[in-house]
Design a protein with these regions (language model features):
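C-terminal helical/coil "lid" or tail adjacent to the Rossmann-like core of SAM-dependent
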Residues: 2-25, 29, 206-262
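Conserved alpha-helix/loop element of class I SAM-dependent methyltransferases that forms part
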Residues: 32-50, 67
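Class I SAM-dependent methyltransferase SAM/SAH-binding core
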Residues: 55-57, 61-113
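A short acidic, Gly/Pro-enriched loop at the edge of an enzyme's catalytic core
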Residues: 112-123
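A short SAM/SAH-binding and catalytic strip from SAM-dependent methyltransferases
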Residues: 122-135
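A short glycine-rich, Lys/Arg-flanked "PGG" loop and its adjoining helix->strand segment in the class I
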Residues: 137-152
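Conserved catalytic/acceptor-binding region of the Class I
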Residues: 152-219
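Core SAM-dependent methyltransferase catalytic element
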Residues: 201-203, 266-274
């Protein structure tokens, strides 16, 4: 079992003001063209439009769930599960706003112990969930259990061990990278561990889609990222408010001067029962 300061790991225990920071980050990131393209690419590769019943684990505000529902070729049913009732309510609200409320269902639940009958879904998606899990192996076992024969899964997340934001001082850059990573994820190397974990859970890896989001000069995608990270790091107890504010100020100033550098590698794993 992992022990972590990661606020995303305990969204069922966060106060509403912190959950609003999480929700805003999920929506801003999810709507950015770079992130939306990665989602669309792996949904295409898993042939999501042909699936009758799809489960979105750790759905958050429903970014991936709604993206599937909006696809012109998708005619199936969708269920999103998240640990936080606050985020589930946000997901329902966004779905109604996009006139998708009759096509999607959102429920509160723990991905480690799903209250779902075995063999219920043709596809299971875990979009930006695995880096926040206490026990990835247990969640993989649940994904395998609720998947129908011939079904498909997709796991998409950041390889957060690769995430970096450059400051003027190299040593401080490394220190702050480590602190920020510790404050926003539970397992920064989980995507590197998936090949053996998927095999152990009874899955064969069908496809791996790597992508990298790097911004040089000016922060766009990463602007909302560093702003939210600076708010969450003190909550995690990894940095003080002053340290977080100074880090953010330096990065935004670098962006204003055209000197920003921020990067992270992402992977989508598509698997099927072995």
């Amino acid at each position: 079992m992992a022990t972590s300061a990661d606020p995303y790991r305990i969204t069922n225990k966060l106060e509403p003001s912190r959950l609003e920071v999480v929700a805003a980050r999920l929506e801003t990131r999810g709507r950015h063209a770079l992130f939306a393209r990665s989602l669309s690419d792996y949904l295409d590769r898993m042939d999501i439009d042909s699936k009758a019943n799809v489960l979105d684990l750790g759905c958050g505000t429903g970014v991936a769930t709604r993206a599937i529902a909006r696809r012109s070729g998708f005619k199936g049913s969708l269920m999103g599960i998240d640990l936080s009732s606050h985020l589930v309510e946000a997901a329902r609200r966004y779905a109604v706003e996009e006139k998708l409320g009759d096509r999607v269902q959102f429920e509160t639940g723990d991905s480690h112990t799903l209250a779902i009958a075995s063999g219920s879904f043709d596809a299971v998606v875990a979009h930006t969930l695995f880096s926040h899990l206490d026990d990835p192996a247990k969640v993989l076992a649940e994904m395998r259990r609720v998947l129908r024969p011939g079904g498909v899964i997709a796991i998409f997340d950041g390889d957060y061990a690769s995430m970096t934001f450059e400051l003027a001082d190299e040593v401080r850059s490394r220190q702050m990278d480590d602190a920020i990573i510790a404050s926003i994820v539970t397992n920064p190397r989980v995507l590197r561990q998936l090949p053996r974990q998927l095999k152990k859970a009874g899955f064969a890896v069908d496809t791996v889609l790597p992508s990298i989001i790097t911004e040089v000069g000016t922060a766009d995608f990463w602007k909302s990222g560093v702003e939210s990270f600076s708010k969450l790091a003190p909550v995690a107890g990894v940095l003080t408010e002053a340290q977080s504010a100074a880090w953010l100020e330096e990065l935004l100033a670098a962006s204003a001067r055209g000197e920003f550098f921020g990067s992270c590698v992402y992977y989508a794993y598509i698997g099927r029962p072995a």
